[in-house]
Design a protein with these regions (language model features):
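Conserved nucleotide-cofactor-binding alpha/beta core module
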Residues: 70, 74-184, 191-193
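General "foldedness" signal
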Residues: 35, 39, 56, 83, ...
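Class I SAM-dependent transferase core
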Residues: 1-98, 113-125, 206-210
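Short alpha-helical interface elements
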Residues: 31, 35, 49-53, 94-100, ...
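Intrinsic-disorder/low-complexity coil detector
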Residues: 15, 45-47, 135, 260, ...
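Short, intrinsically disordered/low-complexity patches at protein termini
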Residues: 46, 105-107, 129-131, 200, ...
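Short, structured coil/loop segments at alpha-helix boundaries
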Residues: 1-4, 15-19, 34-35, 109-111, ...
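SAM/dcSAM-binding transferase cores
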Residues: 1-3, 149, 179-267
């Protein structure tokens, strides 16, 4: 299957794709950013681009989700876009085509293995404008970044906007990303106005964690277990009424897990 055919199928399924997005998606070959089979991608499923040394899987999102993120980013030519993670460079390459030679794409990649993969794939990619790949610690050291960004896309689940990133969003700009815990998140557009943040809820989503370390942690790790219980409890609590006594017991369990030392043996 070609990208043109895939985009046509997404449009037929009701996924909003404007001409700028369509052109960029068709132009960028996902196979350049992964060595794994693309069969799942052609069937609108996520595909891996990297397995880390600790066994965590990093994926390129399903095409419909890629198109959805691009739609909600409201990208125009010449914009400066920041990505927290870039799906192995694939998403950055698409956005680079969209912003063109007058725009910039800045990737902040927290995980070293993922960053090296991203740098390697983008090095042999013909960019339209400028793409830079940074470590989190680099952000405060590059003077140009202080001018700020109109758009920031977070490509993995987080609970809050990192302070160092929120400070770089210009007034009237916004952060788009999946906010929540490991079980479920809400795709939020968080717009910055006069120092305050205003949320637009764009629906429920399921993304892997932005922090790859969470994927590399055993599910029996006390903090990981507490996060999963809390997230699942919030999800269920939004659908059915739970007795206050039960709520209190669950909250106490979560608190107790978070107070446990991280090196407790559980094998």
């Amino acid at each position: 299957m070609s990208m043109s055919e895939l985009v046509e199928r997404l449009e037929a399924a009701g996924i909003p794709i404007d001409d700028l997005t369509k052109s960029a998606m068709i132009d960028i070959d996902p196979g350049h950013f992964t060595d794994y089979d693309l069969e799942g991608f052609w069937h609108d499923r996520p595909i891996p681009f990297l397995f880390t040394g600790f066994g965590a899987t990093r994926t390129i999102s399903a095409p419909h989700m890629i198109a959805t993120l691009l739609h909600h980013l409201e990208i125009n030519k010449g914009q400066d876009i920041m990505l927290i993670g870039s799906k192995g460079g694939y998403l950055a390459a698409i956005i680079d085509r969209m912003v063109g030679e007058e725009g910039t794409v800045t990737i902040v990649e927290p995980h070293e293995e993922v960053r090296l993969h991203t740098e390697d794939r983008l090095e042999s990619h013909l960019c339209s404008g400028m793409i830079r790949v940074l470590r989190p610690n680099d952000v405060g050291e590059i003077e140009h970044l202080s001018e700020g960004f109109e758009r920031v896309l977070i490509t993995g689940s987080v609970r809050e906007i990192p302070n160092s990133i929120g400070e770089l969003v210009i007034d009237g700009g916004f952060v788009l990303g999946p906010f929540g815990g490991p079980v479920h998140q809400r795709l939020l557009k968080r717009e910055k106005q006069g120092g305050d943040w205003f949320d637009t809820d764009l629906g429920g989503v399921v993304f892997g964690p932005m922090d790859v370390g969470e994927s590399e942690t055993s599910p029996l790790d006390p903090i990981s277990l507490a996060n999963h219980i809390e997230d699942a409890f919030d999800l269920v609590g939004g659908m059915i009424e739970i007795e206050e006594s039960t709520c209190a017991r669950v909250r106490n369990l979560i608190l107790a897990l978070r107070e446990m030392p991280p090196d407790v043996p559980y094998d």
